[in-house]
Amino acid sequence: MSVIKCNPTSPGRRHVVKLVNGGLYKGKPYSSLLSKKVANSSKGRNNYGRITMRHIGSGHKQRYRIIDFKRNKDDVFAVVERMEYDPNRSANIALIVYKDGERRYILAPRNLNVGNKIISGLNVPISPGNSLPLSNIPVGSIIHNVEMKVGKGGQLARSAGTYVQIVSRDGEYIILRLRSGEIRKVRCECRATIGEVGNNEHMLRALGKAGASRWRGIRPTVRGTAMNPIDHPHGGGEGKNFGKHPVSPWGVQTKGKRTRSNKRTDKFILCRRKKK
């Protein structure tokens, strides 16, 4: 993959930084693994038509690719048929073909190439793309697509360039270190995939213009100080100073206030994530 900075032939090209990956498949996605529902069809509205998620709307139509996060087809080898772009996530995806002819999409790990063989199971080799329980993975290994509940499918480390490291074992639990700095316990029966997620240069891209955000369904974000008092607690007044602690449009503190409400699973978090 190469990073290309565009020439300033126009104001919209001046700040664009693109990622070019010549190994991605140029054709249409595998139709049997596409969801019937359009991925971005709600536009941030609920069934009453009211905005439930701000700054979302319009954007190009996106078909959702059904990704196999469970990797529960054990002891059957699969071959990587092709690598594809997925508009619904920062990571690329890989189309794999099992020996019996079944095809599935998986997250494309780093250093996984077309033609490589991968397998899932209880005791499989430790190589990128293979999936197995945490209890059978050596301490210190780099993994991704980690389950938090047995059989539910991977939930941790699914974005481009992310990974989780196994720190130690504690009886029936495995202690993991996340990229955020959080250290937490997960059941040893939970599965994970070896390696880190690919496309780690994703963070280097720059959209370069407002229209590129609109193509992705991202609408403008207006500052609260630029609004009227009826629209935002920061609105109104003379000058730019709003004279209070920063809050959301609904009056909730917006800098530093903890929003985690699931106290039931606090016992699994040994160390909270680092402050940015």
UniProtKB/Swiss-Prot annotation:
Keyword tags: Ribonucleoprotein, Ribosomal protein, RNA-binding, rRNA-binding
HAMAP family, per the entry: Ribosomal_uL2_B
PROSITE patterns: RIBOSOMAL_L2
GO biological process: cytoplasmic translation
Family, similarity comment: Belongs to the universal ribosomal protein uL2 family.
Superkingdom to which the source organism belongs: Bacteria
Keyword NADP: no
Database matches in InterPro entries: NA-bd_OB-fold, Rib_uL2_dom2, Ribosomal_uL2, Ribosomal_uL2_bac/org-type, Ribosomal_uL2_C, Ribosomal_uL2_CS, Ribosomal_uL2_dom3, Ribosomal_uL2_RNA-bd_dom
Pfam families: Ribosomal_L2, Ribosomal_L2_C
MF-aspect GO terms: rRNA binding; structural constituent of ribosome; transferase activity
UniProt keyword Transport present: no
Record function comment: One of the primary rRNA binding proteins. Required for association of the 30S and 50S subunits to form the 70S ribosome, for tRNA binding and peptide bond formation. It has been suggested to have peptidyltransferase activity; this is somewhat controversial. Makes several contacts with the 16S rRNA in the 70S ribosome.
Region (Disordered): 224-265
Protein name per UniProt: Large ribosomal subunit protein uL2
